[in-house]
């Protein structure tokens, strides 16, 4: 079955932002307090983006890949807010959770990014990692409670790559640390090329579960995606609904059906050249619509009937 490709092939850097379709505008247009219709860019939802804590020889830095910031601005139409990997900086875990809850309540969406680091295995009762495995305990200590509280408080959540793995662990699932060493699994790692477009090139198909959220959003049963991960889902979390698998059976997407708001996790990277790819834009459009809906409610603005 011929599928769509979930990453663009163009190399142009300057891109215009596509206008919303009439259907999207009918469904998600906000109405200003004055009663005048607002266009899609008139209200930018606040979207928090997860950060990594990295040492670069000159100290420790909270970092976010530029592609995630650009996707939040241009594909979501959001004002991005970087969420530092605060870890245990507030002392006791309860203080960290209280701080995160204050942050969550001010956000209209959360975007969980990818990262070369692995979730520490003690969070899912896994075996010790091999020597040299990259970890980010401060990020784990931030994102795992952030995920649970964002979902339970009705904040739209879109998770990418490591973000998917974090959501699975946060909700009680487990991970393969090295998917390519699991019997029957392909190597899901990317090439080691200095050319980013080579690393993010189409790698394999994913089969989409009929009738699920992803199927409803894309209208496709198969798409082709990039692949840049060694870690992956082993046991799917009890609250998660499988949305897509690779041809080797590896989990590629899941949703959280009991979440009050949009909650979707992808193993691939739709943020890479998102504006050039219709599949990626359908996903970001759905996340954006959910974020605008929360922004309207949070600011006390009326919202037209949501799309079915």
Task: Locate each region found by the language model.
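Compositionally biased, low-complexity flexible segments
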Residues: 7-12
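Active-site-proximal beta-strand elements of phosphoester/diester hydrolases
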Residues: 264-267
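N-terminal beta1-alpha1 cap of cysteine-dependent amidohydrolase-like domains
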Residues: 4, 15-158, 169-176, 180-217, ...
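A short, structured beta-strand/loop element
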Residues: 260-262
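Glycine-rich beta-to-alpha active-site loop
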Residues: 159, 164
